[in-house]
C-alpha cells in the first residue's frame, strides 16, 4: 500500500480528482492544487483504496508496468506544471511558479551544494546523468529567460566537477562556481552571495539580484518532463546511520513517492539494534519521523542515529540558529538528551521573517559571546546549539572559557557514522575558482593542486594551520569588545578602567 501525501510542496494540500475504487497507473493524476501548490501523481499501478484529508491510499497491483501515464503540456513551462515538479532540495516550492519569470538575461543558479553532511544523492546524479542534468538546466533557462546558468558545487567534489567540465562544451552558457565545504553553502541567499557577490536582505528573493535558484535534482526532473512527458513521482534519496550494512551513506535513485521510511531502510539493510531517532533530511534541518512515514518529492535523506546521550538533567541553554533546527526541534532534542531547558537565545544574525527565522548573512558569523554570557548568567552548565560552521566556531571561542559544555544538534548523528563533531572552523571560507583556458572555457586544476582537504559539516577538525591569518578565530577579549559586553577606557596618567555592560 502506498500512502501518497497531498501536500508535498509549499502551499495548500492538493485536491483529489480520483475516488475509491478507481484504477490508476504510474503517473496517473491523483490531485490538483487549490491555490499555491503542485499536481500529485501515482507512483504505482494499482487501486485507489481510501482518500483522507491529507493523503491517498493506493493498493499496488501485483504486476507493475515499466511505463507511465504521460503528461500533455505543450511548452516547457506547462510541462513542468503538469508534471507537478517542486523544489527537490527540501523546500518544495512549485517549480513552474518559480520559473514563470522574465529574468531579462539574468542568471539561473543551480544549487548542487548538497551542503548537509552525509547526503550523497545529488553527486550520484551528476556522475550517472550529467548530460540529462545539463539539458534540464537548459530547459529551465529557456523558461525564465536566463542568459547564463551557473552550477554551484563544492570544490571537494573533484570527480563530479571534472565530469561536468568534459560535458559543458555542448552547453556554452553554463559554467561552474566552486564553493567551500562549509554549512550552509546551499542556503538560497548564500548561493546568490557566493556566485554573484550580492548579499540579499533576509526578506528578498533571488529575483532581486536578477537570478533564480533551483536544485540540481529539480533540473533532472525538468528534463524528464520535457523529453519523456514524465510526471514527477520519483525521488533520489540517501540512507545512512545505524544500519546492518554499515554506516556509509547508501544512495537510492528513483524511489517511488509513497514508499515508507521503513521500506527504504530495509532496502539499506535494516536498523542495527537500538537507535535514537530517524531523521528526514540532513543532520542540521532534518525532522524526526517514524518507520511508517511516506517518502515525498522533498525527502532527500533518511538518517538512523545511535541512542541519545544522557545529560542527567543538566541545566541547558538553547541557541536557536536560522540555519539549523527550529525551537520545536531543539526542545525535542532537550527532552531526548534528558536535559533541563533553562534559557533560550536566538543567534545574533537571526531575524524573524513572517514567522520563520532567516540569517542576515548565512555562514558568516559576527560572534555569539553575548549569547553565551547570557546562558552563564542564567546558571546553565551546558548549551545546545544548531549553528552553522562559522557560528559554531565563535561559540567555541567563549563557551569553554566559561566552563559551559557545548552540544551541537548534529552530534548524535555524526557520532553514529564515526565523524568528528562540529566545533572549530578549520578551513578557509573562500576557495580558488577553476582556471580558464585561452578560449575562455573552464578547465580542471593542475593535478598537483587538485587535492583539497574536507571540512564543513561534521568533517571539521581543529587545525589552526589551515586558516588564513585574517580568518583566525578572534580572542575572547576581541569578541567581547566587538559585541559591546565591556569597554576599556584608557586615560593618560590614570588607571585602566574596564566597564562591563
Regions found by a protein language model. Give the residues of each.
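Iron-sulfur (Fe-S) cluster-binding modules
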Residues: 1-85, 142-151, 167-175, 248-292, ...
Amino acid at each position: 500500500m502506498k500512502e501518497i501525501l497531498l501536500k508535498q510542496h509549499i502551499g495548500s494540500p492538493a485536491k483529489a480528482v480520483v475516488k475509491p475504487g478507481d484504477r490508476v497507473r504510474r503517473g496517473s493524476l491523483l490531485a490538483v492544487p487549490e491555490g499555491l501548490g503542485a499536481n500529485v501523481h501515482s507512483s504505482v499501478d494499482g487501486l485507489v483504496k481510501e482518500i483522507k484529508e491529507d493523503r491517498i491510499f493506493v493498493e499496488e497491483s501485483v504486476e507493475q508496468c515499466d511505463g507511465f501515464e504521460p503528461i500533455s503540456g505543450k511548452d516547457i513551462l506547462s510541462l513542468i506544471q503538469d508534471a507537478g515538479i517542486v523544489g527537490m532540495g527540501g523546500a518544495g516550492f512549485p517549480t513552474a511558479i518559480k520559473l514563470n519569470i522574465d529574468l531579462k538575461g539574468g542568471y539561473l543558479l543551480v544549487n548542487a551544494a548538497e551542503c548537509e553532511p552525509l547526503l550523497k544523492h545529488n553527486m550520484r546524479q551528476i556522475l550517472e546523468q550529467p548530460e540529462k542534468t545539463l539539458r534540464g538546466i537548459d530547459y529551465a533557462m529557456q523558461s525564465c529567460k536566463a542568459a547564463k546558468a551557473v552550477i554551484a558545487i563544492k570544490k571537494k567534489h573533484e570527480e563530479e566537477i571534472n565530469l561536468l567540465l568534459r560535458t559543458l562544451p555542448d552547453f556554452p552558457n553554463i559554467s561552474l562556481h566552486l564553493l567551500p565545504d562549509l554549512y550552509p553553502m546551499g542556503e538560497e541567499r548564500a548561493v546568490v552571495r557566493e556566485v554573484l557577490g550580492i548579499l540579499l536582505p533576509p526578506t528578498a528573493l533571488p529575483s532581486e539580484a536578477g537570478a533564480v535558484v533551483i536544485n540540481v535534482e529539480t533540473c533532472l526532473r525538468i528534463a524528464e518532463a520535457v523529453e519523456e512527458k514524465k510526471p514527477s513521482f520519483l525521488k533520489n534519496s540517501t540512507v545512512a546511520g545505524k544500519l546492518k550494512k554499515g554506516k556509509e551513506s547508501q544512495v537510492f535513485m528513483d524511489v517511488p513517492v509513497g514508499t515508507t521510511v521503513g521500506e527504504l531502510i530495509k532496502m539499506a539493510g535494516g536498523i542495527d539494534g537500538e537507535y535514537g531517532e530517524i531523521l528526514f533530511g540532513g543532520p542540521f534541518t532534518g525532522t524526526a519521523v517514524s518507520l511508517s512515514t511516506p517518502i515525498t518529492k522533498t525527502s532527500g535523506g533518511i538518517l538512523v542515529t545511535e541512542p541519545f546521550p544522557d545529560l542527567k538533567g543538566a541545566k541547558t541553554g538553547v541557541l536557536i540558529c536560522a540555519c539549523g533546527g527550529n525551537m520545536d526541534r531543539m526542545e525535542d532534542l532537550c527532552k531526548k538528551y534528558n536535559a533541563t531547558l533553562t534559557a533560550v537565545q536566538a543567534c545574533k544574525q537571526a531575524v524573524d521573517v513572517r514567522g520563520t527565522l532567516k540569517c542576515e548573512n548565512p555562514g558568516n558569523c559576527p560572534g555569539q559571546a553575548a549569547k553565551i554570557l547570557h546562558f552563564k548568567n542564567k546558571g546553565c552548565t551546558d548549551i545546545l546549539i544548531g549553528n552553522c560552521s562559522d557560528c559554531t566556531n565563535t561559540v567555541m571561542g567563549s563557551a569553554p572559557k566559561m566552563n559551559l559544555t557545548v552540544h551541537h544538534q548534529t552530534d548524535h548523528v555524526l557520532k553514529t557514522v564515526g565523524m568528528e563533531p562540529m566545533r572549530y572552523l578549520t578551513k578557509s571560507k573562500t576557495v580558488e575558482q577553476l582556471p580558464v583556458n585561452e578560449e575562455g572555457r573552464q578547465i580542471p586544476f593542475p593535478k598537483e593542486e587538485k587535492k583539497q582537504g574536507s571540512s564543513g559539516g561534521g568533517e571539521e577538525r581543529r587545525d589552526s594551520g589551515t586558516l588564513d591569518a585574517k580568518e583566525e578565530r578572534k580572542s575572547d577579549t576581541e569578541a567581547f569588545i566587538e559585541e559591546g559586553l565591556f569597554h576599556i577606557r584608557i586615560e593618560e596618567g590614570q588607571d585602566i578602567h574596564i566597564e562591563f555592560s
